[in-house]
Amino acid sequence: MKAIKIAIDGPASSGKSTVAKIIAKNLGYTYLDTGAMYRSATYIALTHGYTGKEVALILEELEKNPIFFKKAKDGSQLVFLGDEDVTLAIRQNDVTNNVSWISALPEIREELVHQQRRIAQAGGIIMDGRDIGTVVLPDAELKIFLVASVEERAERRYKENLEKGIESDFETLKEEIAARDYKDSHRKVSPLKAAEDALIFDTTGVSIDGVVQFIQEKAEKIVDMS
């Protein structure tokens, strides 16, 4: 049976990662959290006080402490920068609020996209992000673009933060998500947009199981036809 490449794109908190992880597990595919990679680069910049003018220093740190993933005992994914477990650190609000400008740096995107493509070569992979279907994996057999209302996405992020013990304010989250949408869709390099051949799916009011079922049925149909 042919293993395909699945690209899931969409704005912040549209459910990409949650859905991608479940589908990867169901299909026995590799899940690559590209967002965690950009968050890791952001964490480096914030930790060292680097600005957008110091891209070379950020890349140097990434070379010294490469990003890699491990599985925890409970099956969840851990993110490392060299020897440092940054799984929780990269989900903090300061990282969330700064990841857009890091993602917009051409040199950072070029390096991380190179890494992502290398990992995806063999197929049997599912990636989620902002530009997977348009830039990273334009040859992906299945491209999905998830959308949802700002209100619903803020509610999801609020619940996630509570579960992780991160203090949050719902109204502030709404403002931050709307601001990030604007930044992501208006940046010069790899702006957030659906690929021309992507299936656009509005997840507002749809359960996680419902979204998983929709994508998985499409994937299985493509595999059966190939």
UniProtKB/Swiss-Prot annotation:
<dbReference type="InterPro" id="IPR003136">
    <property type="entry name" value="Cytidylate_kin"/>
</dbReference>
<keyword id="KW-0808">Transferase</keyword>
<comment type="similarity">
    <text>Belongs to the cytidylate kinase family. Type 1 subfamily.</text>
</comment>
<dbReference type="GO" id="GO:0036430">
    <property type="term" value="F:CMP kinase activity"/>
</dbReference>
<dbReference type="GO" id="GO:0005829">
    <property type="term" value="C:cytosol"/>
</dbReference>
<keyword id="KW-0418">Kinase</keyword>
<dbReference type="GO" id="GO:0015949">
    <property type="term" value="P:nucleobase-containing small molecule interconversion"/>
</dbReference>
<dbReference type="Pfam" id="PF02224">
    <property type="entry name" value="Cytidylate_kin"/>
</dbReference>
<dbReference type="InterPro" id="IPR027417">
    <property type="entry name" value="P-loop_NTPase"/>
</dbReference>
<dbReference type="GO" id="GO:0005524">
    <property type="term" value="F:ATP binding"/>
</dbReference>
<dbReference type="GO" id="GO:0006220">
    <property type="term" value="P:pyrimidine nucleotide metabolic process"/>
</dbReference>
<protein>
    <recommendedName>
        <fullName>Cytidylate kinase</fullName>
        <ecNumber>2.7.4.25</ecNumber>
    </recommendedName>
</protein>
<dbReference type="GO" id="GO:0036431">
    <property type="term" value="F:dCMP kinase activity"/>
</dbReference>
<dbReference type="InterPro" id="IPR011994">
    <property type="entry name" value="Cytidylate_kinase_dom"/>
</dbReference>
<keyword id="KW-0067">ATP-binding</keyword>
<feature type="binding site">
    <location>
        <begin position="10"/>
        <end position="18"/>
    </location>
    <ligand>
        <name>ATP</name>
    </ligand>
</feature>
<keyword id="KW-0547">Nucleotide-binding</keyword>
<keyword id="KW-0963">Cytoplasm</keyword>
